């Protein structure tokens, strides 16, 4: 067994008032290393099925390779503090109070232990007491909530599949083998241009608050297009950059749709690194919700100026046909500029530690609750259609905010995302809040938050977060985005058959099923 740190935990007390029973950390370590069930752990093991016992052993063996600086910085953010506070109702200190501070200390110390690193067992070893108390009543409630959510999700996914089949039965029969395969690149060659615009406005950046800032933008333009191209502005996710999902920008451009991908410097990869280096006090500033949408509005302003003064740009872009697209936090941004109103009342109601489980979605949305009422409307009327993948919406918009969107809207959801933006809370239920008649919900089953991400960006994520066959998800996203923007920016009704369940059934793959619906009952 490993050497114990000073003041190491010796046992875990499971409390189910008035009954208590005990398991030593040594017994858990023997089980993790050798698979042997000994001592007090036997009373727990006999109640578990073989697959559950194997899962427990796998969790105990799991090691996360993150530096103690990164772990420490993350643990002091509002986002992570809310999550730890919730777990602290289950894992208590030796004084039977919320285990928040003890858990945070133990996780940081375990990460700093170069020999053993950040493992569940090592976190237990570094707990700052002789005893860890587990409140089984709270744990039971916790697992009931999680189980209920999973069952509700599965029931909802099945209901959506049935609704999709009902819709398919009413749709005209189309032989898609005779139509272009939208998963394949289009006929246009793609030109990439990078430009930097100086924006004279205040904004949080990785170096602090700036009174003006550079807005870096990559453009993906169809070459030698016989007509002006519609424009889609793509918003990247939190902690990423404008290169993420470049594949879909190139794909759209090959089909004659110009794409601009701005860099949101207050929530990009560089900002995230600055935070973990200690240069920023928190993982995001509340004003970033406003600044991201402003980036897109400023970009459209600059492009209008270019089109009016530069013959090259005038010959390329039709700024009467503008759409927005985004993934994750970028999807949240895209919905804001499309008309979703930030819902301060909903944020103040929902931003409590007891209103979420494992997801980071609500804590991230809760940063917006300190915005002022005059910062809640970010709509740009030049935007004619919005395509949002895995957006975070439940609290920041709610039914009142989502109901403000009046333009065509496509929402993409990964059904088995339990970590970043749960499908039921952030996509499926919000889809029912939309009042626009031109709305679509595309469901990737059993997809995750990363079901259409490029492999190089998700290689280090655990398999349950990556999900099955992201390559298939990327093909779905490519095809659906082309069809959606051709219909709703260019009025190409010959692309409309691609936006229904009949087409979804044609391209759907067993490892990652695709369902598309146009309506759902609330």
Region spans (language model):
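Mature extracellular/secreted ectodomains of secretory-pathway proteins
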Residues: 21, 32-176
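Short beta-strand element of the alpha/beta-hydrolase
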Residues: 227-237
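Gly/Ala-rich beta-loop-alpha elbow adjacent to hydrolase catalytic centers
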Residues: 237, 318, 323-334
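Alpha/beta-hydrolase active-site loop
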Residues: 280-319, 336, 346, 351-364, ...
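Short beta-strand/loop motif that positions the catalytic acidic residue
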Residues: 405, 411-413
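Conserved alpha/beta-hydrolase "acid-adjacent" motif
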Residues: 419-426
